[in-house]
Structures are given as structure tokens and as C-alpha cells.
Amino acid sequence: SALIGVAEIISELVSSYDYIIAPVASGGTLAGLIAATHNTATQILGIGVLKGQGYLEELVQSLLPQSYAHWSICHEYHFGGYAKRTDELFDFCANFYQQNNIPIEPVYSGKLLYALKDLLEQGYFPKGSKILVLHTGGLQGSRLNP
């Protein structure tokens, strides 16, 4: 199950974090992060990659063994829904690759990293926060035409 697999990722961390952020679609990864960090001060922030305010929260909660309060989902970065994107997001993904030599795609990782950049610019995270960004892989979305 996703909860067990993600718990293994958390158990291998050698440092603690104030925030862990990850993309959210089916809810399994986020639920695993929430369950694995419930005894810590870490806040879990999901970035919704599909339209689903309310729905995504219910989906994640249904995967958890109990209710936890240290998580939330940000719904402002879905760019129209699952596998949808704008020219702005496409350009962000291309520029990110050019600047960092790390390929990202507009379905999951592009939306996640765009959200991170925007939230940092807005001052969402308190100064000095340690943030772990979970890149969940998958570059199949990079084949989408502009």
C-alpha cells in the first residue's frame, strides 16, 4: 500500500523538516506522508493537481487510519485540472529544466514546483523553514503537446 511505501521514505530521512510538500491526485502518497509524520511537528502540504476542493480532502481522509490535523491541500495550482496546463506552466517547466537540468512535467512535478515557487514568493512559509519537496517522478506528462 502507498501508506507503507511512503512511511519507508520518511523513515530514511536523516533530518527533520517543518514542511513536506507533494502533489496530490489519488491521495495515496499524501495519506502516507500524513500517517508517517503524525508524531512529528512536520506540516504536510499537498498541491492538488486536479480540480477537487473538498473531494481531495475526503479522499485522503478515507485512506487514513484516523483523523490528523497537521495537513492541508492547496487547490490554486491545478491549472484547469488533471493533465491540463497553460502556456505559463509549460514555459515554467521548460525554464526549470534549462536552469536546473532536472526534467519536470506539467501533470505533477511542474505544478508542484510552480506552487513552491509561488508560495515562497508570497511568504507562505515562515522564514527559516526547512522544506522537503517530494518529486514523485513520472515524466510521461512531458510528452503533452504545447
Predicted segments — roles?
Residues 2-80, 134-146:
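Glycine-rich phosphate/pyrophosphate-binding loop at beta-loop-alpha junctions
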